[in-house]
């Protein structure tokens, strides 16, 4: 022992030479027992260190040179002992330290010691395994050699040089070469598995048919050694030995009687020592060799990567075991002992523990299950471990079942390899597990622990054990296998040896193998002994194995033994070797082992299909058969163990091993692989990424002491770890991960025989990739896998989701859940692709239902639950989910999803939306999926064209938006028209006025046409576009059939009235129809949306006609009309939108009820409609919707209704709005805006802040009460009104008007009837509007529907004249609304964008809810209503304001940096590029809220401009002046939002004001325009004077009311644009009046009818007759004439006043918000008063309205004029006063600034003067000092000069010395160069001579060949004969080679037999000694008993004598 220890001590340092030198001695001794002792005892010290490699002793004999068979064995053992002794120490350290020294030293030692030790280890296993194998092979020389070779190979393989060794040594060992070759095949990863298999298969093939039969029968994995073990077990000897072994191992020191018992004891002890080096101390005498062997094995292990892995793993294992021990103190202690005293401490410290462990081992081994249980108990800390451990052998299946029973176990188990993730997780779960797992090499023990720690470990361990169990089962099937099972480790060893056996181990170290041959003999003998011991102690091993697996932790030895036995044992070695083995295997494949090699290939394939390993890991454990397969190829055991051990040993190979074991399982149980692959894949799936992360375990590999080995193994280890993640087919996740998982291929890469591993690698990788297929669920994880954290990601796209999206890499559980749910949700997951990450905004979620219907709406990537909810919530929304693909990421910013997208998406997305947001960054996989989705979306061109409005197909819009930029789509959608406006402000203004409106409508229609469905609508409108639109409004649009007319009308309205709406709604419709076509929510949405819209307009129109129409529509629209639209549509719409909005708004609670219907059913319909109307809006959610939808809808509806349904259009609009819940607020806003004009709310709106808004609402409500139920509620409801209020009002008014009853409508807009009717609809609005004061609006009974209609018309600014005006107002008002709505939409969009960007809880929620903010607030989400009211100051930028493009920005250093700029409502953001924008990777942003001005600025390059903010000035440059101009305009608009006006034309003052007053100004302007329109119409109709005027009175803009609305609009717009330019105003007025004329001409036909209730109804309900139209035209012409007389002057005044007011307000806004607030309060109060006054006058108003109808159509009533003039005057005075005050304040401020600047300048000048003084003084002092120094005289200068001279001289001297040195150096170098030249010449000459010699030889060879040919030719009778002769000669050569191979094989077998004989002899000697000692002890015992009896007799006699004496004394005393 000491000598061997010393030797070993030397080995580490001396390296291979010493190991080799000592190896012969050790080997000679070893086989004899010294080496065995060395192995046994030395492991004591190294044992701890080598505990991990304790298994190595199993293969100890085959140490360095398999060729040195005889010497090798002894030497191997000795070397192992020595090598191990020291190597273990060193190696142990190397294990820890090997990376540094290990690679070099370890490789040597590995080759030598490793060869010996791995060989020993291989022998231990190889002896066991190979002995089994060889016994199967009948002592197949290769078997032993294989063991040795395998052992060596593993080391070599591990070293990768092992391959070389194998290759190099192989030639050396020709006999072993077969095996080596065979082993080479094994050497590949599969070598491990294949080794077992091959050994099983090959053993018989190679060695014996009997062996083969045995292997095939069940000892296939047993090898010859196993066979022997079986035979012994059959003979009972093995069983006895086994028990002895168990005892021996258990008692370490007590060799079981019987040579084999001894051998087994030794082997077992070896293993025990390996497992428990400490034990080996007790065993020292008997186990020294074992210890040494163990140590050597351990050292070889250390030497071999497997061992390194093992060792590392042992360390790690120890560590892990420590970790495991953490689980179980026992384990900890043993492991700690192992670890703590790896070499000395191990055998010293562990010795007691080990002995205890030994005892425990005995118990544990005998109780191996108990140890298992102990392990399990240690594992008990980890139930999986315990269970699996407890189940280890027995519940191989149970373990498998445990795995099955416990998903983790199953997963871990199935995933043990497969779920590296779980493993990783287990590892993660238990660092031990992780570490252990990470130390897969160690993992036999570690893995045992890891398994103990983690089910995987348990699994692996259990797997090994289970393989033991299975092997046991296999063995159970065949006693031999049982023996082997007992030998499972033996089989493990055998398996390991089989691998080792697989000549690959031995062969890889062929030289070693030859040495190992001898050593192999010894080692194999040792191994045989080990095998025998294991075999004999199969239970000991088995138990030991189990204990190793189980006890391993309890007893370090066992753990080490188990782990080492497995891992260190050839198994590990095999794994190590398998790498090396693979090369050998080919030979084996040549040999009978060919079958094994085949398996190897299978293994390789499995290896290739690493995923199989998980399966196999699972299956091996799970299915005994698999294990049998594994067993059969003991490597199965290995596979498990191999996977475990190999994994443990060779992280890489281990991976391979794990993989390999699965692979083996795959090879053997390929089906299992597939099955398990299938199973694990899912599980693993998740882990893939996790697995790779799990790969962290590889880190332990990373720290592998033997990096070179770890490279194969480390890689393998990593691979195993990766592999576990990798192994799982789940690699899917791993696709990315898979490549990582592919790490196992790394081991393959390391594979000495890459060609072999390549197959494995290819297979492995392929399987890995395939496994990824398995974890399709993981697909989620592709990108999501990492992000899997949020299931939503899980489904990037259903299509992408080959894998279940749920298989989130995130977590198995989530993944599992995901997997379970994903099937349904997967589609939804689509949302999550990108959405999942950014899912924050639902809108993206459902860019377009039809597009994404594939995905369940709920499948938000965000979370399954949300997704599910979404799914449940809105099945139709699933498509929305898809939205998330791209949308998800962008979801962060709804803008990307066109607002419509948001709107659409919002409904469904909200639930998942948050989830989406939560789910993950758009990132990774999502992108791809999103892109696909995008492609789908992008395929929808209409959205782009319709993007403006078209976003209705948000999916498309979003797609495009997304594809392009969600923002862009949204902007186009929102601002498409506005952009056109901004681009052509005049045109827009004209359009707003109505002049351009038609074109815009036409454009909208065209756009709509561009969208499929819209085209039909558009076709009508476009066909009729201008006129038909008007007509449709007045006449055709009013066909009484609500459906027909509404449809046509709506189409027209949408097309013409809501240019935007048409544009969008058509698109929406198109998209919706598309959706319908898609069959998603399309039908409902399309039908619901379209019909609902159309019906809304239709019913609205009809409502106008038949009040019942309203009633029906009211209830019908909500229930009936909407049902027509799609019965549920209304409710659906209402609920749906509300739902959507709830989701959007986050008011799902409010929308709770509707959500289910709304979201599920309603959104489809409602969404359809909402999508049509609301979609654009929804995207903006409410804002855009409300504007686009409500504004447009109401505009659209109003235009339709304008004829007869003016109010209805609006009312319907509200319905629609309500229906389009998103628009609810928006609709309310629209209603507010639309109605405001009627109520004057519009007028008021512009300036009203919250108070104004509330007052407005109140005012509206009152007003509504007077004549317009809905109007008031709309106003009262405010936003609510918009949707619910409006709906109520609509419904109420229709009812009230038709029925002439005044119903109280709640501010919610829910009237009792309506609420019941559209409770869902209204509730949504109500919910939404609940934020607004819910004021009951009791609509005063409108006696006549006409009056009501008229009033409503007034309210809607569509009075009967409104019909006229409506055409105008719908166009004008609509344009204004359009602008408003657009502005609002923009705001909404911006808000949407913001919310999306801000990822407000719910984009819609944020949008809608956030919309309601205090005036100062800049809502992240814009509420168009608030914006219109002026509550929200910030309005959406025009299209120009929404801008993207490349520009350069001047950074601080003064460098130009090019960025992708994106202009949003509140900031200018810049990104690296558009992709970064998609990913939301912001480089910076410029806050435009503090922007004061945007000016051109000359820069050196391109065209520059500056953005001035309060904080800084930003300089940017555009490529062209046009781009710069566009940017400046957009920025100015953003800074000073104006509806249509070109901001660039605004005066600075206006610009400043614009920002402030934009919302109010724009709103007021629009309101004014609408109101003006209504008044203008009102002039024609009775309500114009009364209805509109009061409204006008309310509004500051009221002055505008007197002037023609269009002109006023023009003026107001012009004013904002260029309020100071009278000429422009006049020009605009002229244009607008002209346009109005056109409008009126088109609507003239309606005007005549409007005056009378009938007429208005008729206009609303039915198309006008030609006569009527002509009359209307005439009247309108007259009105225009009068209008142009009156209004122009008034307009001039009004606009100025209004402009001044607004400008003033704007100015005041910035300068004095308080004044503005006060003024707004006053106005609101005035509005209230006016409202009450109107109510009071309501009864009179009706008649008056009729009377007013008599007023010439072109004229404005005197009252209205006077009122407007008075208002104008008062407002003008106020404005002038304000201007004066402002001027004074400015003067004061300027004066203060002047003074401050002067003071500052003075201070600066003073400080500068002081600084100059100081500088002058300093300079003066310097000069003075110089002068003084000069005055001192030349003396100082001389001194200084001398000093300088001296310094220079010194320096010169130093330089001269250096020069001399350099000269000498140069001379020396010159001489050297000459010498080299001479040498070179000489070498050249020699080369030439050699070349000549070579040529001569070549010529001789040619002559010989010629002679041979002639000889052959002469022998051949003919060509054919010659050919046959040639063939025969070739055949003879082949036969010769075959015979040589057979000879080598036989030599190997002989060597193995010699080794076995030596082992047996040693066992015999030990047995004899043991018997002698036993007899002696018996004699002593008998003698002692006799003496005791005698002493007792003496004592009894003495006591009797004393008693007698006492009695006598007493008697005497008496």
UniProtKB/Swiss-Prot annotation:
Q: Which residues in this protein are found as Phosphothreonine?
A: 1879
Q: Which residues form a coiled coil?
A: 1711-2010
A Pfam cross-reference name: PH
- Compositionally biased spans, kind Pro residues: 769-778
Q: Which InterPro entries match?
A: Actin_Cytoskeleton_Reg, M-RIP_PH, PH-like_dom_sf, PH_domain
Gene Ontology CC terms: actin cytoskeleton; centrosome; cuticular plate; cytosol; midbody; nucleus; stereocilium; stereocilium base
Positions of region (Disordered): 1-67, 84-1225, 1263-1343, 1357-1404, 1539-1671
**Keywords, ordered alphabetically:** Actin-binding, Cell cycle, Cell division, Cell projection, Coiled coil, Cytoplasm, Cytoskeleton, Methylation, Mitosis, Nucleus, Phosphoprotein, Ubl conjugation
Q: Which GO terms describe its molecular function?
A: actin filament binding; ubiquitin protein ligase binding
| Name of this chain's protein | TRIO and F-actin-binding protein
What's the source species for this entry?
Mus musculus (Mouse)
Taxonomic lineage of the native organism: Eukaryota, Metazoa, Chordata, Craniata, Vertebrata
GN (gene name): Triobp
């Amino acid at each position: 022992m000491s000598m061997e220890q010393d030797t070993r001590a030397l080995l580490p340092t001396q390296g291979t030479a010493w190991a080799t030198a000592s190896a012969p001695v050790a080997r000679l001794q070893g086989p004899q027992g010294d080496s065995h002792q060395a192995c046994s005892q030395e492991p004591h010290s190294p044992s701890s260190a080598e505990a991990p490699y304790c298994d190595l002793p199993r293969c100890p004999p085959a140490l360095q040179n398999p060729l040195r068979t005889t010497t090798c064995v002894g030497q191997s053992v000795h070397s192992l002992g020595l090598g191990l002794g020291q190597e273990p120490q060193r190696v142990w350290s190397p294990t820890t330290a090997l990376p540094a020294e290990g690679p070099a030293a370890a490789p040597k030692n590995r080759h030598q010691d490793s060869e010996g030790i791995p060989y020993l280890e291989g022998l231990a296993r190889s002896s066991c395994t190979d002995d089994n194998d060889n016994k199967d092979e009948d002592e197949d020389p290769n078997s032993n050699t294989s063991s040795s070779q395998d052992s060596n190979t593993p080391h070599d393989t591990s070293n990768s040089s092992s391959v070389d060794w194998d290759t190099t040594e192989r030639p050396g060992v020709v006999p072993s070469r077969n095996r080596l070759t065979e082993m080479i095949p094994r050497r590949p990863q599969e070598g491990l598995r294949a080794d077992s298999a091959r050994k099983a298969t090959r053993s018989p093939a190679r060695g014996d048919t009997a062996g083969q039969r045995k292997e095939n029968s069940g000892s296939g994995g047993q090898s010859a050694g196993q066979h022997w073990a079986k035979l012994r077990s059959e003979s009972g000897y093995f069983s006895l030995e086994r028990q002895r072994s168990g005892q021996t191992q258990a008692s370490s020191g007590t060799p079981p009687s019987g040579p084999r018992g001894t051998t087994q004891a030794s082997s077992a002890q070896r293993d025990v020592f390996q497992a428990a080096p400490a034990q080996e101390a007790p065993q020292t005498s008997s186990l020294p060799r074992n210890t040494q062997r163990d140590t050597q094995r351990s050292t070889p292990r250390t030497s071999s990567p497997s061992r390194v892995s093992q060792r590392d793993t042992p360390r790690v294992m120890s560590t892990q075991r420590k970790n495991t021990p953490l689980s179980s103190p026992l384990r900890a202690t043993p492991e700690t002992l192992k670890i703590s005293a790896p070499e000395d401490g191990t055998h010293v410290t562990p010795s007691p523990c080990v002995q205890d462990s030994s005892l425990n081992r005995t118990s544990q081994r005998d109780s191996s299950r108990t140890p298992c249980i102990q392990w399990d108990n240690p594992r008990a800390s980890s139930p999986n471990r315990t269970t699996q451990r407890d189940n280890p052998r027995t519940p191989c299946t149970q373990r498998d079942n445990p795995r099955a029973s416990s998903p983790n176990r199953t997963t871990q188990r199935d995933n043990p390899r497969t779920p590296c993730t779980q493993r990783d997780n287990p590892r993660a779960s238990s660092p031990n597990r992780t570490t252990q797992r990470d130390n897969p090499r160690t993992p036999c023990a570690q893995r045992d622990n890891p398994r103990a720690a983690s089910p995987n470990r348990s699994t692996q361990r259990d797997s090994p054990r289970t393989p033991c169990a299975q092997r046991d089962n296999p063995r159970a099937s065949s006693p031999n296998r049982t023996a082997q099972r007992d030998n499972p480790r033996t089989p493990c060893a055998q398996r390991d040896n089989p691998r080792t056996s697989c000549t690959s181990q031995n062969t890889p170290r062929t030289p070693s193998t030859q040495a190992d041959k001898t050593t192999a003999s010894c080692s194999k003998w040792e191994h045989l002994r080990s095998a025998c011991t294991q075999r004999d102690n199969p239970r000991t091993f088995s138990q030991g194995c189990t204990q190793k697996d189980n006890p391993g932790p309890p007893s370090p030895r066992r753990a080490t033994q188990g782990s080492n036995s497995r891992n260190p044992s050839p198994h590990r070695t095999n794994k190590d070797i398998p790498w090396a083995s693979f090369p050998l295997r080919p030979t084996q494949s040549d040999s009978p082992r060919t079958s094994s090699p085949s398996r190897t290939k299978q293994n390789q394939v499995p290896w290739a299909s690493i995923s199989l390993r998980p399966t196999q890991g699972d299956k091996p454990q799970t299915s005994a058969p698999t294990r049998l397969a594994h067993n059969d190829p003991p490597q199965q055991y290995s596979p498990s163990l191999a996977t475990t051990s190999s994994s443990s040993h060779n992280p890489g190979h281990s991976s391979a091993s794990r993989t390999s074991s699965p692979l083996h399982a795959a090879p053997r149980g390929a089906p299992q692989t597939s099955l398990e692959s299938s199973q694990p894949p899912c599980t693993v799936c998740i882990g893939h990424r996790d697995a790779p992360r799990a790969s962290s375990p590889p880190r332990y590999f990373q720290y592998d002491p033997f990096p070179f080995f770890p490279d194969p193994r480390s890689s393998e280890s990593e691979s195993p770890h990766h592999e576990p993640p990798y192994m799982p087919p789940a690699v899917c996740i791993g696709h990315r991960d898979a490549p990582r998982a592919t790490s196992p291929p790394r081991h393959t890469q390391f594979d000495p025989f890459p060609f072999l591993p390549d197959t494995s690698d290819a297979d492995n990788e392929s399987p890995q990739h395939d496994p990824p297929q398995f974890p399709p669920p993981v697909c989620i994880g592709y990108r999501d896998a990492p992000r899997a954290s949020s299931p939503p990601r899980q489904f990037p796209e259903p299509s992408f989701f080959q894998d279940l999206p749920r298989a989130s890499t995130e977590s198995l559980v989530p993944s599992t859940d995901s997997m379970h749910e994903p099937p349904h949700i997967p589609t939804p997951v689509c949302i999550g692709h990108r959405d999942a990450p950014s899912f924050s905004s639902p809108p993206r979620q459902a860019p377009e239902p039809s597009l994404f219907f594939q995905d369940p709406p709920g499948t938000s990537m965000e979370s399954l639950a949300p997704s599910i909810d979404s799914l449940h919530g809105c099945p139709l929304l699933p498509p929305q989910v898809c939205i998330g693909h791209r949308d998800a990421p962008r979801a962060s910013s709804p803008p990307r999803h066109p607002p419509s997208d948001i709107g659409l998406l919002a409904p469904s997305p909200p639930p998942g939306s948050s989830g989406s947001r939560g789910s993950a960054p758009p990132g990774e996989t999502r992108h791809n999926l999103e892109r696909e989705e995008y492609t789908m979306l992008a395929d929808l061109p209409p959205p782009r064209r319709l993007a403006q409005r078209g976003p209705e197909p948000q999916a498309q819009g979003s797609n495009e938006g997304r594809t392009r930029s969600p923002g862009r789509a949204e902007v186009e959608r929102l601002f498409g028209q506005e952009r056109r406006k901004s681009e052509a402000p005049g045109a827009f203004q004209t359009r707003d006025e109505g002049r351009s409106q038609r074109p815009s409508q036409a454009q909208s229609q065209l756009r709509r046409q561009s969208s499929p469905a819209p085209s039909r609508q558009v076709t009508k409108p476009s066909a009729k576009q201008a006129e038909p639109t008007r007509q449709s409004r007045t006449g055709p649009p009013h066909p009484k059939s609500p459906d027909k007319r509404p449809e046509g009308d709506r189409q027209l309205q949408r097309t013409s009235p809501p240019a935007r709406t048409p544009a969008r709604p058509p698109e929406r419709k198109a998209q919706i129809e598309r959706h319908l076509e898609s069959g998603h929510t399309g039908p409902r949405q399309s039908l619901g949306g379209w019909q609902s819209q159309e019906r809304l307009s239709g019913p609205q129109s009809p409502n106008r006609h038949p009040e019942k129409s309203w009633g029906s529509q009211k209830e019908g629209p909500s229930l009936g009309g909407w049902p027509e639209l799609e019965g549920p549509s209304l409710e659906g719409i209402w609920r749906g939108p509300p739902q959507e909005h709830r989701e959007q708004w986050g008011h799902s609670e409010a929308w709770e009820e509707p959500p289910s219907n709304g979201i599920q059913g309603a959104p489809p319909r409602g969404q359809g409609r909402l999508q049509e109307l609301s979609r654009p809006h929804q995207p903006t959610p409410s804002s855009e919707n409300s504007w686009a939808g409500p504004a447009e809808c109401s505009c659209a509806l109003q235009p339709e209704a304008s004829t007869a349904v003016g109010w209805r259009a609006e009312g319907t609009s509200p319905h629609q709005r309500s229906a389009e819940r998103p628009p609810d607020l928006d609709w309310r806003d629209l209603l507010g805006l639309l109605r405001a004009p009627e109520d004057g709310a519009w007028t008021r709106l512009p300036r009203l802040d919250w108070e104004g808004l509330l007052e407005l609402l109140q005012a509206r409500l009152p007003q509504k009460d007077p004549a317009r139920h809905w109007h008031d509620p709309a106003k009262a409801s405010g936003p609510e009104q918009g949707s619910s209020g409006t709906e109520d009002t609509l419904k109420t008014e229709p009812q009230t008007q038709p029925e002439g009853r005044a119903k109280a409508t709640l501010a919610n807009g829910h009237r009792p009837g309506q609420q019941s009717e559209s409770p869902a609809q209204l509730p949504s609005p109500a919910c939404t509007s609940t934020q607004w004061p819910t004021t009951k609006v009791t609509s005063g009974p409108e006696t006549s529907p006409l009056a009501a209609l008229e009033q409503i018309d007034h309210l809607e600014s569509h009075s009967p004249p409104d019909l006229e005006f409506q055409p105008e107002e719908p166009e004008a008002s609509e344009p204004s609304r359009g602008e408003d709505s657009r502005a609002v939409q923009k705001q909404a969009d911006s808000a949407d964008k913001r919310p999306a960007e801000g990822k407000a809880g719910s984009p819609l929620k944020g949008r809608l809810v956030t919309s309601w903010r205090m005036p100062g607030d800049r809502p992240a989400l814009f509420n168009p209503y608030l914006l219109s009211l002026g509550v929200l100051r910030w309005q959406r930028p025009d299209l120009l304001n929404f801008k993207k493009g490349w520009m350069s920005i001047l950074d601080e250093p003064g460098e130009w940096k090019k960025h992708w700029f994106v202009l949003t409502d509140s900031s200018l953001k810049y990104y690296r590029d558009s992709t970064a924008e998609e990913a939301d990777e912001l480089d910076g942003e410029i806050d435009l809220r503090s922007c004061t001005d945007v000016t051109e600025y000359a820069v050196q390059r391109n065209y520059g401009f500056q953005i001035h903010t309060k904080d800084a000035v930003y300089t940017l440059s555009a490529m062209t002046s046009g781009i710069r101009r566009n940017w400046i305009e957009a920025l100015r608009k953003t800074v000073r939002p104006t509806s249509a006006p070109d901001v660039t034309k605004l005066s600075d003052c206006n610009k400043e004001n614009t920002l402030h007053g934009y919302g109010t100004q724009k709103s007021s302007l629009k309101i004014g325009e609408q109101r003006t329109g209504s008044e203008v119409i009102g002039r024609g109709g009775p309500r114009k004077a009364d209805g509109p005027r009061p409204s006008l009175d309310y509004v500051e803009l009221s002055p505008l009311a007197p002037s023609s609305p269009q002109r006023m609009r023009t003026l107001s717009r012009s004013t904002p644009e260029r309020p100071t330019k009278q000429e422009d105003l006049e020009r605009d007025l002229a244009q607008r009046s002209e346009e109005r004329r056109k409008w009126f001409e088109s609507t003239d036909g309606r005007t005549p009818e409007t005056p009378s209730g009938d007429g208005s109804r008729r206009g609303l309900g039915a198309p006008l007759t030609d006569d009527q139209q002509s009359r209307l035209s005439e009247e309108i012409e007259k009105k225009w004439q009068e209008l142009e007389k009156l209004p122009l002057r008034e307009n001039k005044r009004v606009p100025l006043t209004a402009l001044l007011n607004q400008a003033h307000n704007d100015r005041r806004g910035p300068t004095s918000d308080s004044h503005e607030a006060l003024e707004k309060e006053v106005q609101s109060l005035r509005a209230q008063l006016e409202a009450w006054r109107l109510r009071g006058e309501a009864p009179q108003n009706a008649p008056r309205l009729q009377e007013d109808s008599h007023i010439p159509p072109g004229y404005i009533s005197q009252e209205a004029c006077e009122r407007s003039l008075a208002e104008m005057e008062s407002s003008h005075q106020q404005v002038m006063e304000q201007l004066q005050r402002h001027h004074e304040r400015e003067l004061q401020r300027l004066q203060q600034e002047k003074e401050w600047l002067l003071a500052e300048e003075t201070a600066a000048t003073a400080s500068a003067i002081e600084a100059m003084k100081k500088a002058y003084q300093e300079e003066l002092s310097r000069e003075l000092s110089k002068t003084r120094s000069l005055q001192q005289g030349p003396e100082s200068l001389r001194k200084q000069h001398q000093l300088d001279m001296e310094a220079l001289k010194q320096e010169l001297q130093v330089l001269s010395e250096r020069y001399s040195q350099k000269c000498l150096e140069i001379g020396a170098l010159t001489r050297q160069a000459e010498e080299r030249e001479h040498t070179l010449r000489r070498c050249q000459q020699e080369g030439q001579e050699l070349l000549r010699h070579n040529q001569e030889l070549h010529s001789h060879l040619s002559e010989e060949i010629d002679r041979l040919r002639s000889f052959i030719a002469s022998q051949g009778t003919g060509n054919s004969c010659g050919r046959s002769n040639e063939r025969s000669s070739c055949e003879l050569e082949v036969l010769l080679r075959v015979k040589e191979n057979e000879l080598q094989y036989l030599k190997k077998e002989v060597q193995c037999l010699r080794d076995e004989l030596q082992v047996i002899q040693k066992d015999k000697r030990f047995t004899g000694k043991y018997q002698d000692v036993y007899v002696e002890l018996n004699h002593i015992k008998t003698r002692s008993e006799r003496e005791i009896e005698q002493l007792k007799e003496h004592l009894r006699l003495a006591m009797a004598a004393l008693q007698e004496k006492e009695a006598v004394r007493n008697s005497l005393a008496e």
